[in-house]
């Protein structure tokens, strides 16, 4: 079962940001398409 963005807690979203920010491409995508989309694109879910 997939988890929609609305189901993530602020703590979970912050964890995704911390993983993504070490990857400049992921961080850039997060700025334009959102953290959940960027994390999923680079790291799967």
Curated annotation (Swiss-Prot):
Q: Which residues bind Ca(2+) 3?
A: 21, 27
List keywords of the entry alphabetically. Answer: Biomineralization, Calcium, Disulfide bond, Gamma-carboxyglutamic acid, Hormone, Metal-binding, Secreted
Show the disulfide pairing.
Answer: 20-26
Instruction: Output the superkingdom of the source species.
Output: Eukaryota
Q: Which stretches make up the Gla domain?
A: 1-44
Keyword Calcium among UniProt keywords: yes
Q: What GO terms describe the biological role, i.e. biological process, of this protein?
A: bone development; bone mineralization; cellular response to insulin stimulus; glucose homeostasis; negative regulation of bone development; osteoblast differentiation; regulation of cellular response to insulin stimulus; response to vitamin K
Question: What coarse category fits the chief subcellular location reported for this protein?
Answer: secreted
Could you tell me which residues carry 4-carboxyglutamate? Answer: 14, 18, 21
MF (Gene Ontology): calcium ion binding; hormone activity; hydroxyapatite binding; structural constituent of bone
Which InterPro entries does the protein's record reference? GLA-like_dom_SF (IPR035972), GLA_domain (IPR000294), Osteocalcin (IPR039176)
Q: Where in the cell is it found?
A: Secreted
Supply one GO CC term from the record: extracellular region
Q: What PROSITE patterns does the record tag this protein with?
A: GLA_1, GLA_2
Would I find Calcium among this entry's keywords?
yes
**Positions contributing to Ca(2+) 2 binding:** 18, 21
Question: Member of which family?
Answer: Belongs to the osteocalcin/matrix Gla protein family.
- Outline what the protein does: The carboxylated form is one of the main organic components of the bone matrix, which constitutes 1-2% of the total bone protein. The carboxylated form binds strongly to apatite and calcium.
Could you tell me what this protein is called?
Osteocalcin
Source species = Danio rerio
